[in-house]
């Protein structure tokens, strides 16, 4: 549905500025002053935290004021209701039981001032920015590709900040703050849209965003109103059985009904809510009400009639009414002057719009100001009758309401049925009398239609109660039976709505927020969860981000109230929202939503998020946020490491026997190296860091990626082993370390010994192949060349001696380090000492395989060192070491490797024979 023109939710009246010829004629002389006086009697802005009844059908009044309510009996629960502990229904209104003095004093005061102050009530609790700030913000936003998205990005963090700031006992203050945040953004987006160039696609997106946020704002408003009342009702069960007295007046009967019947009360809250939405929009046309310069109605017709009297001899060009009483056009079936007819239509449209917004008093003021005090009086008859003097008393008190309200209502019903009247005039009196059939034709939007149904439902239920509880003297005339005997339910209203023939209403009925509003009104949480599930399965992550935010916070709100939400759906909503936050890089928000998932899912979800975090500082920040959110940080970091390690499905591969000792480090390897950072932030995780580091290094060693393994080793803090022992001692443990930790420490030392041996061999190998070159002398060398040769030879001998000395030192060092690996203490290299550890078949298999991969190769390298440095006899001693039953190194050699070792030992024996020694290196006895 095209939403490119959203300034807000439309009312049944076209609210563009309509200035008639009469208005234009007088506008040069006098304009309506629109004052911003919030102290005006009728100008008090509507607090966002409460929905105050503004409709003539608002039957709720003094019976629900705080002074007349019983004290709460469960203060521990009622704290949820906020500081006042009262539902919005406890507020006085201008409804059926309202303060008469506010309406009966129909003076000539400028009603427009009140109108303006109502406009100033829009988003009253939002943070007000200075004009300069707004201009600067709007200017910046206009440069964005999607100004609406850019302007509203802060809402994600704002909502979380508000959520964390409030406890479960101030949940309704939290909802009010949600509404205020939305209202603030609506103000900003409205300014952006108003300054935008028409037709640009990016601003149509902004308009759509504006509409979404407006819908969210009013949905939070509805939520607070309904659930505050529902909680209040659960605390005040005694009101369920309230019954009016025998001689109770209409007003008293209705008071009791509202106390007793939650359907009537909450239906009225829906009416109030819908009227508050319309009231927010009322300012769009309030500046253009300039019907008359004086309080004279039908002045053009009056002028024409006077002219005809003066020029009666000239005849009349067209028929006009000849009398100017209110009933004249209908009675005479003659028209007014064209200008007056135009003004009359506009006036009636404005009046209906005011009635739709619950501003009956303002509608009466407008009538009086336009010279139609009689019409203002017709809007007065809905007030419920009450005579406080019936019960006696020393002082005579004024009578309230209309004793002939029933006759007035029947007259309104008949007027609404009369097709001779304008459709908006009929709709006005249809709204006052509960005539749904005549009210619906002017209701073009979802909000207007729902308002019509609920207003009529409340009106009908109240009227039924009055008819059964109040003694009447004259029953000769009754309202239609279908009205008086209607069996209204909330479900029936929405069934009727689904069956409407208005295409726009049907389309709006399928919009996300209207579906949410429907289920909130019905109080059907399970149905709402089912809808959420459908949306996720159909659209998933393509749902608007702000809608996902709303869905998430709505679920959290319902959970706070102790209401059951379907676990599977709630989890999917949270997971989808978390994925949105990840994709939009709201990294600081993710932990606090993840903690609302079940623990195993929370660990998996947050670990998945952390896999994509690569910067060291950001990693540290994410872990700190996880701690604040009470997530299991240790399990999460362990899971991150395991997840990344599992991405490599490569198997352990056997080393070839080439002298090349290292394979290049890939990007995948780099991820595994860096993942260890997750485990070193917290000293309490050093044992886990050791275990995971060992697992990664085992893979690297098997693939001859010694440099990569070395980088992992460096990631582990040097004091890790000492830290593990210290933490164990701090716990007051006198027993040895857990077997898993003990074995991990030993494995870590094994890997360190192996890496040190390889690093030293690399140095030896490099030095061995960088021997100084002996100079040569040409046979026909000159004397000068011979002298130069002698200098080069002396330098060579000096360099060779230095090289030889360094080589001997490196040889001794590398021999020691290699023997440390081959003859590793307490059972051998990569062999666990503690056998009481938890069984880990994969680790055991890898360690056995590493012995078979690394020890034979290291033995061959040691032979190369010894053979290259002329230590042939020691070469032969390798056979004793390999065959030793103490170390059992022969078990890690394959037949091919043993054959190759024997071949190398044979070469060393031949060198000994060339030196005149026996094959084992001993002198030959003569």
From Swiss-Prot:
N-acetylmethionine sites (modified residues): 1
Residue numbers carrying Phosphoserine: 4, 10-11, 57-58, 70, 87
Acetylation among keywords: yes
Asymmetric dimethylarginine: modified positions: 60
Modified residues (Phosphothreonine): 46, 55, 65
Superkingdom in the source lineage: Eukaryota
Keywords, comma-separated and alphabetical: Acetylation, Centromere, Chromosome, Kinetochore, Membrane, Methylation, mRNA transport, Nuclear pore complex, Nucleus, Phosphoprotein, Protein transport, Translocation, Transport
Principal location listed in the UniProt entry: nucleus
GO BP, one annotated term: protein transport
Compartment(s): Nucleus membrane; Nucleus, Nuclear pore complex; Chromosome, Centromere, Kinetochore
A GO term, aspect molecular function: structural constituent of nuclear pore
Complexes and interactors: Part of the nuclear pore complex (NPC). Forms part of the Nup160 subcomplex in the nuclear pore which is composed of NUP160, NUP133, NUP107 and Nup96; this complex plays a role in RNA export and in tethering Nup98 and NUP153 to the nucleus. Does not interact with TPR. Interacts with ZNF106.
Function: Plays a role in the nuclear pore complex (NPC) assembly and/or maintenance. Required for the assembly of peripheral proteins into the NPC. May anchor NUP62 to the NPC. Involved in nephrogenesis.
Descriptive protein name: Nuclear pore complex protein Nup107
Lineage per the UniProt record: Eukaryota, Metazoa, Chordata, Craniata, Vertebrata
Gene label: Nup107
